[in-house]
Structure formats: structure tokens, C-alpha cells
Amino acid sequence: MLMEHDMSVFKFLITSFFLIVIFTTSQSYAKKAAIVIDFDTKEVLFEVNANTKNYPASLTKIMTLYILFDRLEKNQITNQTKLKVSRIAASRSPSKLYLEEGSTIKVEDAIMALIIKSANDVATVVAENISGTEKEFAKLMTSYARNLGMTNTTFKNASGLPNRAQLTTARDISILSHSLISNFPEQYKLFNTQKFTYKGKTYKTHNKLMLSYEGADGIKTGYIRASGFQLAFSAVRNNKRLIGVIFGLSLIHI
């Protein structure tokens, strides 16, 4: 009974967190949405505009990572596989690692750069090395989305950089987040990493919630001007996991 009570309190706190975050933000962003689900049962504990389409920003990289993990799982690549950097990838706007054209980056470093730094150049590197072009990789991402049950999502790039046709919903991102944790539990542990070092430079996580909320262990933050700040996150208490997604914050509350 005590554990059930503690879990009820946990659910209440998570739901309250989402309510406070959404309804204390500025009205400068019309599209606000959120969803909280129980990981084990997939029960929706709270939702607001969960099916409203919005720009995913860097939450896009969750799918880029999902596909990368899938390739690793199928032994099509290894953590030591070197990915070549093209001129197009090197030219991507920040956030980025400032990779140089013609250089390479190992898969294991690319994974951490996407999780911690949210590097747009690395996202394009992954896309081009898997599918030849980022356009083709985006088609692959959308195909994966449909197979996972993400019916309202269309990807146009691997990074989340602005594209009016790249759209998703809070519900779809919760489905993706659940699938990533379920299908790649060992890889998901990497999302709890708070910093990583690449070529002598240390990068720290953008996800401040992991530093302040007990039990939080991921997942991803995002921002573009057109949509505001976004967050997909997961937390565990008393061996119970919840997943939450927020869209359309006008400032970082976490």
C-alpha cells in the first residue's frame, strides 16, 4: 500500500509539474501541448493538445538516435565505425561540434554528441552515412515513425532545424520515447550522461531537469523560434517509470 501511495504522489507531482509549466508560460506561443504516460501500462495520466501538430526541433534527434541504435543492434555498424563528414554536414548551423569537411567521427562519439550537445552537424553526418543523403534519411525516419505507430509525424531532416513540413505531436514523441527505452534499454542508459569529452573539449547536457529532479534520466530538449522550447523526459521512482513530453514553452522552466 505504501508503494502504491508513493506512486500516486509521484504521478500527482509529475502532472502538477506539467500543469504549472504549461499554464504559467507567456501566451506568445499559441501551440502548447503535453502528455504524461505510465511506462508499464501506457496509461495516459495527463494530456493537453496531445494530438496538435508542432515542430519537433531537436526532439527530432530521438529518432535519429533510434535508427542509429537499430543499426548497431543489427550489427550493420559498430561503435567504432567511422562516419565521414561532408561539406553539407560541416556547414550546418549550431548547435554543433564544428566538424571539418573530410574528417571522421566514430559512432560512439556521434551518439554522445547527439545526446549531450544536440549537434546538428553530427545529425547530418549520421543521416548521410546511413542513407546517402539527409533527404533519404528523413524518408527512412518517417517510415520508422509509421512502424512505431506515430501517425501524425513527418520528418524532413535529421536534426530538427527549421522546416515547415517537419511536424509531430506530443503523443507521437511519447510513443517514440517509449519505444526507444523499451527496445534499446542498454543504449538508453547513455541519456543519463551529464557530460562527454570530444577532442579535448567537454560538453555538458542541455537537460537541466536531470540535475534537479530526482529519478530523471533523460531524454531530450529542443528549441526553435517557431515552436518554443520542448522537452521529452522520463523519470523513475519506486521502480516505476513515467514519460512526459512538453511542447511550446516560451522559456526554460527546467
State where each predicted segment sits:
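Active-site-adjacent loops and short helices of periplasmic peptidoglycan-processing enzymes
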Residues: 24-171, 180-181
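Bacterial N-terminal signal peptides
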Residues: 14-22
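Ser/Thr-glycine-rich phosphate-binding loops at phosphate-binding pockets of nucleotides
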Residues: 59, 253-254
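Bacterial N-terminal signal peptides that target proteins for export
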Residues: 4-14
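Domain-terminus/edge residues, biased toward the C-terminal soluble/receptor-binding domains
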Residues: 150-154, 162-167, 171-252
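N-terminal start-of-chain detector that recognizes signal peptides
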Residues: 8-9, 55-57, 83-86, 203-207, ...
